[in-house]
Amino acid sequence: MTIDEIIEAIEKLTVSELAELVKKLEDKFGVTAAAPVAVAAAPVAGAAAGAAQEEKTEFDVVLKSFGQNKIQVIKVVREITGLGLKEAKDLVEKAGSPDAVIKSGVSKEEAEEIKKKLEEAGAEVELK
């Protein structure tokens, strides 16, 4: 398989499939896909404050409630997770329990995107 063929295959992936690919590559090769951040020299007094503002990088998307539109929420869960109908239904019915994790270890951007999709379907979602 040539590099061009690999790129073509990657172009056909969905956002959730790309996120899964990145996660697997990070695990396989022990690297991170996070963009390097340029850090300016901070004054000594500001260094302690900067450490306190460290932001969480991995989030779990937890379903708190499926609301009034359970069927639509199940469809969105299937789209996000790739689960079958029964598995997605079982997951949605766990709403409110600690086991109702739709996706774990995702970036803030992906977690927000998943939350938005689920809320549009009528679900109540929490990011942990």
From Swiss-Prot:
UniProt gene name: rplL
Signal peptide: none
One term under GO cellular component: cytosolic large ribosomal subunit
Function: Forms part of the ribosomal stalk which helps the ribosome interact with GTP-bound translation factors. Is thus essential for accurate translation.
Keywords for this protein: Ribonucleoprotein, Ribosomal protein
Pfam families associated with the record: Ribosomal_L12 (PF00542), Ribosomal_L12_N (PF16320)
Similarity remark: Belongs to the bacterial ribosomal protein bL12 family.
Record has Ribosomal protein as a keyword: yes
Quaternary structure annotation from Swiss-Prot or TrEMBL: Homodimer. Part of the 50S ribosomal subunit; present in 6 copies per ribosome. Forms part of the ribosomal stalk which helps the ribosome interact with GTP-bound translation factors. Forms a heptameric L10(L12)2(L12)2(L12)2 complex, where L10 forms an elongated spine to which 3 L12 dimers bind in a sequential fashion.
Entry-linked NCBIfam families: L12 (TIGR00855)
Presence of keyword Ribonucleoprotein: yes
Protein name: Large ribosomal subunit protein bL12
Alphabetized InterPro entries for the sequence: Ribosomal_bL12 (IPR000206), Ribosomal_bL12_C (IPR013823), Ribosomal_bL12_C/ClpS-like (IPR014719), Ribosomal_bL12_oligo (IPR008932), Ribosomal_bL12_oligo_N_sf (IPR036235)
Species assigned in the record: Thermotoga maritima (strain ATCC 43589 / DSM 3109 / JCM 10099 / NBRC 100826 / MSB8)
GO biological process: translation
Lineage top rank: taxon: Bacteria
Gene Ontology MF terms in the entry: mRNA binding; structural constituent of ribosome
